[in-house]
């Protein structure tokens, strides 16, 4: 730390957050400092990072290898009681706690962080200065500071001078709540938000993604109320300035498909859409690494170098990484600053209005076509449905698909009612003349997953407009218009019925999946607008 940096850190008054007796503050340390801190030989347990042959540090996040939605809480008070989409109003994770319970949880975290040497990372959430959040993250764990330095937008020296946080995140991963039963909570772990105080607190879970997605949930509360779309999507832009956004749940291909050598990446996960166009919320990417190969995903593989941070991967004794090993979790990840990808929008991660909106789904039922163009009504229907499906493998190789319906392709992060996001998105799409497509990156009647080469060919056809020139035919039940051929794509997969030896198999699977869609969509039919959308969905 320079003398100047030391002075700046010393000027930070952490007592305003209830943190006392802090022995030292490292404010916005360099990557070099963080590397030294997180690989210190005296560190133990989950605090310790290990060096890998690719130059990046790998860490273990403990028993939590993903977010813990059952432990997510929001204070119900005058700020939130009438605006927030609460868990008793629909299928979501926004469980209410009282201000009194919040005070107890907050004091567990402040007690944990007091008297310690702390890392403070000040960063921005949102590339647009008018609507971004100034976020201050406080943690005692070096690699958690590294994670947020990667994931939030890094301020310049000048921007740090007068930095005043709009939101504070206190990560007390080592603190747990012994009184959770008395509080009526799910477990000793907690991720809680107070929108009046503008504070997030974390206890019991070490998973880095809680900090990133926590601020996403807050943007999802603040932006739509200003008429700005807040979206769980990746985005990129072509040479002619044509912007595409890719919505999708985890594992459907958002990061992979938006990282395209022919186009500049805007961002891989969280974006807003305002009067100027599409802008990234983040300063980094958070890519899945399970079964990562240099051949299939060279950009992501090459981004794993010094300053990237790997989570829960298997590191062999010779420092090499086994990306195929999912024994700890299938959700192995890497975070890296966005400039680790060569082809990005610079200097600010933003571009114009989107012309193409792509809904990614990984259908494990083998029913949906690899691509279909959506009508405006179908766009709303599929956005509110937010369907994907996972294959749950068992040791005997029996695989049953598990459907997931997640409103707006991100229900876990929504803080307002899903129809509010649909309304804002459709308004933005109409104003920009954008078109929507559904792209299935999942399985078909062959039992194999649609190849990444075919999916990339489909995306190319959407982006260059050749799909709009293609002849189409109608897929029954779901009433989807699909192309009969596309350049560079295996034509035999475009109608999913053709991938079955017996077409009746598709019929019975389609009926099963359609019933699931209809049952899920019933939650939106309590008003006229929702009822009117039913005919845009599957019909039996």
From Swiss-Prot:
It comes from Aliivibrio fischeri (strain MJ11). GO terms for cellular component: cytosol. One of its GO terms (biological process) is gluconeogenesis. Involved in the gluconeogenesis. Catalyzes the conversion of oxaloacetate (OAA) to phosphoenolpyruvate (PEP) through direct phosphoryl transfer between the nucleoside triphosphate and OAA. Pfam families: PEPCK_ATP. The keyword Lyase applies. It is an enzyme of class 4 (lyase). InterPro entries: PEP_carboxykinase_ATP (IPR001272), PEP_carboxykinase_C (IPR013035), PEP_carboxykinase_N (IPR008210), PEPCK_ATP_CS (IPR015994). Its EC number is 4.1.1.49. It catalyses: oxaloacetate + ATP = phosphoenolpyruvate + ADP + CO2. This is Phosphoenolpyruvate carboxykinase (ATP). Keywords: ATP-binding, Cytoplasm, Decarboxylase, Gluconeogenesis, Lyase, Manganese, Metal-binding, Nucleotide-binding.
């Amino acid at each position: 730390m320079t003398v100047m940096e030391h002075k700046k850190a010393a000027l930070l008054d952490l007592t305003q957050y209830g943190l006392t007796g802090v022995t030292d503050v490292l404010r916005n340390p360099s990557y070099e400092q963080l590397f030294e801190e997180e690989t210190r030989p005296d560190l133990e347990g989950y605090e310790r990072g290990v060096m890998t042959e690719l130059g990046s540090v790998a860490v273990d996040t403990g028993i939590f290898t993903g977010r813990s939605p059952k432990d997510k809480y929001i204070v119900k008070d005058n700020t939130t009681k009438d605006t927030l989409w609460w868990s008793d109003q629909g299928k979501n994770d926004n469980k209410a706690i009282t201000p009194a319970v919040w005070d107890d949880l907050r004091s567990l975290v402040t007690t944990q962080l007091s008297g310690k040497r702390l890392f403070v990372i000040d960063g921005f959430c949102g590339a647009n200065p008018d609507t971004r959040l100034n976020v201050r993250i406080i943690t005692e764990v070096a690699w958690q500071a590294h994670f947020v330095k990667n994931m939030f937008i890094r301020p310049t020296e000048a921007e740090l001078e007068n930095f005043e946080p709009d939101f504070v995140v206190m990560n007390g991963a080592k603190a747990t709540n012994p009184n959770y039963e008395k509080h009526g909570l799910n477990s000793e772990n907690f991720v809680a938000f107070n929108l009046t105080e503008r504070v997030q607190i974390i206890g019991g879970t070490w998973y880095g993604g809680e900090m990133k997605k926590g601020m996403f949930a807050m943007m999802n509360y603040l932006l739509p109320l200003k008429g700005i779309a807040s979206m769980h999507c990746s985005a990129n832009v072509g040479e002619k300035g044509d912007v595409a956004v890719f919505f999708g749940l985890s594992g459907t291909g958002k990061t992979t498909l938006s990282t395209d050598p022919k186009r500049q990446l805007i961002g891989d996960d969280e974006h807003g859409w305002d009067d100027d166009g599409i802008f990234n919320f983040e300063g980094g990417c958070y890519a899945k690494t399970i079964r990562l190969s240099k051949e299939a995903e060279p950009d992501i593989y090459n981004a794993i170098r010094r300053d990237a941070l790997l989570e829960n991967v298997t590191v062999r004794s010779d420092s090499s990484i086994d990306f195929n090993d999912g024994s700890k979790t299938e959700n192995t990840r890497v975070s890296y600053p966005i400039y680790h990808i060569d082809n990005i929008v610079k200097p600010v991660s933003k571009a114009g209005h989107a012309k193409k909106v792509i809904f990614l789904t990984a259908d494990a039922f083998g029913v949906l076509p690899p691509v279909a163009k959506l009508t405006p009504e179908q766009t709303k229907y599929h956005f509110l449905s937010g369907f994907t499906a996972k294959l749950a493998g068992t040791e005997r190789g029996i695989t049953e698909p598990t459907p997931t319906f997640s409103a707006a392709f991100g229900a876990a992060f929504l803080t307002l009612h899903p129809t509010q996001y649909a309304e804002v998105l459709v308004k933005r799409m109409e104003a920009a003349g954008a078109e929507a497509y559904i792209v299935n990156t999942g399985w078909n009647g062959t039992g194999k997953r649609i190849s990444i080469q075919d999916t990339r060919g489909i995306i190319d056809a959407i982006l260059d407009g050749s799909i709009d020139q293609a002849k189409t035919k109608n897929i029954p039940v779901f009433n989807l218009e699909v192309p009969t051929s596309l350049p560079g794509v295996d034509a035999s997969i475009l109608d999913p019925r053709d991938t079955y030896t017996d077409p009746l198999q598709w019929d019975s699977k389609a009926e099963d999946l359609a019933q699931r869609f209809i049952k899920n969509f019933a939650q939106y039919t309590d008003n006229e607008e929702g009822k009117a959308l039913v005919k845009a969905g599957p019909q039996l």
